[in-house]
């Protein structure tokens, strides 16, 4: 049995823009039978794509994200997420992953060192 995956919003954005970092998230995103998608992730990605590329592109992205199992925010996740010292969306995304037996794939420093996280650090760009 494969491990389930939750991909953080930044990973989805790397994937959809085809950046050089998309490779880190492609496997988790493309194996939709093992993909858990917190609804707040769709919100964050839709909002950014809508702002930068318009309604049509944002709707296509949101549709694509629904290939995995979309998970709504419930009271239990909300309360557990509120106990974390993370920003709102990050705490909900992080709490959703273990709740569904998934590993969180991310490049966000907020999650570095936390259990059940597959962290892909962004190389520093020193002058």
List where the protein language model places each region.
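Histidine- and aromatic-rich ligand-binding microenvironments
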Residues: 7-8, 37-38, 86-90, 108, ...
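Active-site phosphate/pyrophosphate-handling residues
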Residues: 10, 76, 91-95
């Amino acid at each position: 049995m494969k491990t389930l995956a939750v991909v953080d919003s930044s990973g989805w954005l790397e994937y959809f823009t085809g950046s050089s970092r998309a490779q880190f998230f492609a496997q988790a995103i493309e194996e939709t039978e093992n993909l858990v998608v917190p609804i707040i992730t769709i919100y964050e990605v839709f909002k950014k794509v809508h702002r930068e590329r318009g309604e049509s592109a944002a709707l296509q992205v949101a549709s694509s994200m629904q290939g995995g199992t979309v998970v709504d925010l419930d009271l239990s996740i909300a309360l557990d997420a509120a106990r974390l010292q993370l920003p709102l969306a990050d705490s909900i995304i992080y709490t959703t992953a273990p709740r569904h037996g998934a590993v969180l794939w991310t490049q966000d420093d907020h999650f570095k060192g936390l259990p059940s996280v597959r962290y892909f650090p962004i190389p520093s760009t020193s002058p």
